[in-house]
Amino acid sequence: MTTFEQFPVWRGFNLQNLYVWKRSDKPFDEKDFQTISEWGFNYIRFPMDYRIICGGTDWNIIDEKAMERLDQGIEYGGKYNIHICINLHRAPGYNVNVPEPTNLWTDKEPQEAFARLWGIFAERYKDIPNIRLSFNLVNEPPDISEEVYAAVMKKAVDAIREKNPDRLIIADGRHNGNSPSGLIRRLGIAQAMRGYYPSTVSHYKAEWVKGAMDFGPPEWPLLSDTAHSGKEYLWENSYKLWEDGINSHNVHVGEWGAHNKTPHDIVLRWMEDNLEIFKEHKLGWAIWNFNGSFGIVDSGRPDVQYENINGYMTDRKMLELLQKYLKY
C-alpha cells in the first residue's frame, strides 16, 4: 500500500506540458513516457498552471479539453509503469515567480477556488490507486508561518478526502520548498523538499531568479582558504533540516538540478554529491526538466557533446550519472 507513511522511492523528471498558460500548454507526447521508462525512471511530476485547467483566470470554469490532456498524461504513466504526481505550480492566488492579483494565504476567494480544484481532481481520479497517482498541492510556498500554511492546505486536503479519502497527498516545504512543517505532517500528508542548494551552482545566470545574473563563476566543491565543501556541506546546509522526515521515509525531493549556464563538469560533480545523499537516505527525486535547461535532453548546454538517443539530443554523461543511482 502506498501511503504517506510508506512513501516509495520514486526517481524521474518534471514534464512541463501544462506548465504555463499560452506558452507551454501542449499535449503530452507518449514517446517521452516510453523513453523515460526505458531509461529506468519511474516518476513524473506535472507542474500545472491553473489557468490552463480553467481555460483562463475564471476559477469557476473547467476546460474539459485541458482535463482530457491531463487524463492522457496520467494514462501514459499507467501504461509505462510511471507514477504521476500532479501539482498546481501556479495556483489561484499564488505563484512563486510572478505575483497573482489575489493572495492565497490571506484571501477567502482564492482559498475556496484552490480547494475546489483539488476536489475536482480527487473526484475525477478517485479510482486511480496511489501507486500510480499522487497530489502535490502547491509549488514552493513562501516564508509564511506554519499556522497559515497548514490552515490553507487543510482546506485542500479536506476537499480531496471528501471525494477520495486515501489519496496520497504531498505538500512542498515552506520558504520555496526548503523548510519542513510539523503542522503539515500532522495532516497525514507527505512533504517535498528542493535540491537547489547552493543557488550559485543550480541557478547561475537564471534570468528569472533575482540576483542570479550577478552570481560569481560557480565552483564545486566550494573552495576557500578555510573550507573544502562538498557532500557534507550539502547535508549540513540543506538536507539535515529535513532529517526527521527523511528518517520517517515520508519526504522526497520534488525538484532539483542545475541550469544550463553552469559549466557541465561542475554540474556533474555537484549532482553526484546530491545523488550520494539521496542514496544514503533512500530519497526519491525529480529533476526539474526532462527536456529543457535543467534536463538530460535538449538542454542547450554549450559545453556538451549531445548524442541522438531514441531521437532525443541527449546529454549521455548526465543520463548515465542518474542511471547509476537508480538502484537503492
Stretches with model-predicted labels:
Residues 28-49, 242-245, 275-277, 281-286:
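Catalytic domains of carbohydrate-active enzymes, especially glycoside hydrolases
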Residues 47-49, 88-93, 173-175, 286-295:
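Short, solvent-exposed turn/loop segments enriched in Gly/Ser/Thr/Pro and often Arg
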Residues 1-25:
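Boundary/entry segment of secreted carbohydrate-active catalytic domains
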Residues 106-232, 236-259, 280-283:
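Active-site region of glycoside hydrolase catalytic domains
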Residues 25-44, 59-90, 97-134, 152-163:
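An active-site-proximal structural segment forming one wall of the substrate-binding cleft
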Residues 48-62:
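Glycine-rich, proline-tolerant flexible connector loops at the mouths of alpha/beta enzymes
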